[in-house]
Amino acid sequence: MAGFKRGYDGKIAGLYDLDKTLGRGHFAVVKLARHVFTGEKVAVKVIDKTKLDTLATGHLFQEVRCMKLVQHPNIVRLYEVIDTQTKLYLILELGDGGDMFDYIMKHEEGLNEDLAKKYFAQIVHAISYCHKLHVVHRDLKPENVVFFEKQGLVKLTDFGFSNKFQPGKKLTTSCGSLAYSAPEILLGDEYDAPAVDIWSLGVILFMLVCGQPPFQEANDSETLTMIMDCKYTVPPRVSAGCRDLITRMLQRDPKRRASLEEIESHPWLQGVDPSPATKYNIPLVSYKNLSEEEHNSIIQRMVLGDIADRDAIVEALETNRYNHITATYFLLAERILREKQEKEIQTRSASPSNIKAQFRQSWPTKIDVPQDLEDDLTATPLSHATVPQSPARAGDNVLNGHRSKGLCDPAKKDELPELAGPALSTVPPASMKPAASGRKCLFRVEEDEEEDEEDKKPVSLSTQVVLRRKPSVTNRLTSRKSAPVLNQIFEEGESDDEFDMDENLPPKLSRLKMNIASPGTVHKRYHRRKSQGRGSSCSSSETSDDDSESRRRLDKDSGFAYSWHRRDSSEGPPGSEGDGGGQSKPSSGGGVDKASPGEQGTGGGSQGGSGGTPSGTAGSSRRCAGPDSSSPSPASASAAPRGAELVQSLKLVSLCLGSQLHGAKYILDPQKALFSSVKVQEKSTWKMCISAPGPSPSADLDPVRTKKLRNNALQLPLCEKTISVNIQRSRKEGLLCASSPASCCHVI
């Protein structure tokens, strides 16, 4: 097995995978381990019995008996005992926050009293429980108090010096640690068992609020003298109530020390829950705390896993065997309770408004566009298909809350959770008229993860077109964290090499997808979104290695911030303000989601263009939104074959947006573009141009403003590999497209 080391007995092989060493003692070593059947992490205390004398062996088995007896939320749980000829394995609950001594040492002046009160109350609660069972710990110290951060608890551990006692009868064994031991133990006298734990509690409280032990001198002799004289100094910053409680516990005479009942009722400890543990806090102290349904479910899992039959499981639980059967049962039970507790916390934290917004974002409204439509996007009416969903995708989308992309009437957005049918078919409002053949379209390149190949049912729409680019398989599992199942289902068995080998892909396997929304719908949704804000983002920044280092946002109060981003970005409908990728503010433009340096090119949004290689070589790109953009340019016609262009489009990010350029009005000011609209950081050979069909816009401009114009295009050097462009919005339409001829913005 993975963690099995030479020298360990075969009884533990196959049950636990032993990992790194957590700590060492004189006779024992504590290792991190994983329970094979449940996968839960545990601590395994491995004790070498060959090194133990008779007295130490007696203490060892006394520890086991006491730990079996005490089962409390504030005491580290013993799951299993494996006894072999040479070693004894104690399978214990694993703490995740270190011990209290290290925690105190990080606070030179001690903890604030509210926090100290919280932890001390839990320790008192655990010791009170032990004393009621007539078990004395006798080695209470901060090193034996372990933090469990996920549970918000502290727990007692190391019952190596613990013992059973009878009320009224005194013990004689001298044990414990000098700095925390009561005077009567150090003298070797007979002592009252509960009183020695009270003394140790006083030392622990002193350390919590003061940051150092009360009796800690240069050597053991001086320390012993201070303990016998009961001399210590409480700093003045400690409150009177806390000082009084410490004094009541650190009494030289055991008969004058406070009892546990007096400590629990002390005024300083009032107002704090002595045990924040609830039913769902682990460890589970008894199988009787589970419901009948949970109990039967766990037994059924164990039977199916060939752990034991039902009768053997029930018998082991009723007799407290502390064997592998009971360990497996309680580890499974605690995992179920932990998941149930986390689910309840999430349910309480989710407000109805958040849930409603999440469902609004979740319904997919995307269609496939065959390859032949990409060459004539503006002249050919686009078809809107009904896209049947697989049950896995339908459930995953609803749960994971990805933002929908148009095609739905704003008045019906709140009804999206009820549209749980296998197909989605949305008809535009009757008032919406199909646009003329010369209508303007806005293109945006995005990644998507769906492979829908269903037939299309044409519906004439005034449209907004969004080209979507599939991410590569290498980015598949990191591009959207919230849909791991779908990431695994998609393209099973494919590799990046297969992409490069596919020279001619059929239209339905095209990576470029389209999404349609009517401008009226988008306009209405823009105002709706602007008034109500937006949900949280689920954007993943792990798509490329360089992604997180080069991210930028636009935080302008006016205008429209352009961004390209992954499918998992929490984006609103095109034209809505502040719904870009990442986690931008509701009133700001969308954040810019950069690709890695080798991913930028000029595919033009539709196969064309092969420029933008990692070396920065410029290529050509055809116009993507103008009325005459149906035919490729000679440069793109002479480029690589269609299959190669498709592969290139998977690797290169194209920036293509519909905008307007009329008269003497520039979208990017030639004078200020390098310092305002385009953010600069590092040098590059990339250039950006904004061009428009028709007459040259430079006719009415003075030479100073047109010095950067070449071939009817404004060319600007860019100093980073991803750009942010701020576009002014048309107030009348609320869209980027206006009534003037459309133009393109290319990275060339």
UniProtKB/Swiss-Prot annotation:
Listed InterPro entries: Kinase-like_dom_sf, Prot_kinase_dom, Protein_kinase_ATP_BS, Ser/Thr_kinase_AS, UBA
EC number: 2.7.11.1
Residue span, Protein kinase domain: 16-269
Location in or out of the cell: Nucleus
Acidic residues composition-biased segments: 491-503
Main localization (coarse): nucleus
UniProt keyword annotations, A-Z: ATP-binding, Kinase, Magnesium, Metal-binding, Methylation, Nucleotide-binding, Nucleus, Phosphoprotein, Serine/threonine-protein kinase, Transferase
Compositionally biased tracts (Basic and acidic residues): 549-558
Pfam families membership: Pkinase
All residue ranges annotated as the UBA domain in the record: 291-334
Gene3D superfamilies recorded: Transferase(Phosphotransferase) domain 1
Biased composition annotated in UniProt, kind: Low complexity: 533-542, 629-640
Tissues/organs with expression: Ubiquitously expressed in all tissues examined.
Binding residue positions for ATP: L22, G23, R24, G25, H26, F27, A28, V29, V30, K45
Keyword Nucleotide-binding among UniProt keywords: yes
Residues recorded with modification Phosphoserine: S162, S362, S390, S482, S495, S518, S606
Residue list for modification Omega-N-methylarginine: R534
CDD domains (UniProt xref): STKc_SNRK, UBA_SNRK
Cellular compartments per GO CC: nucleus
Active-site residue list: D139
Family statement: Belongs to the protein kinase superfamily. CAMK Ser/Thr protein kinase family.
Function: May play a role in hematopoietic cell proliferation or differentiation. Potential mediator of neuronal apoptosis.
Designated name of the protein: SNF-related serine/threonine-protein kinase
Species this protein is from: Mus musculus (Mouse)
Gene (UniProt): Snrk
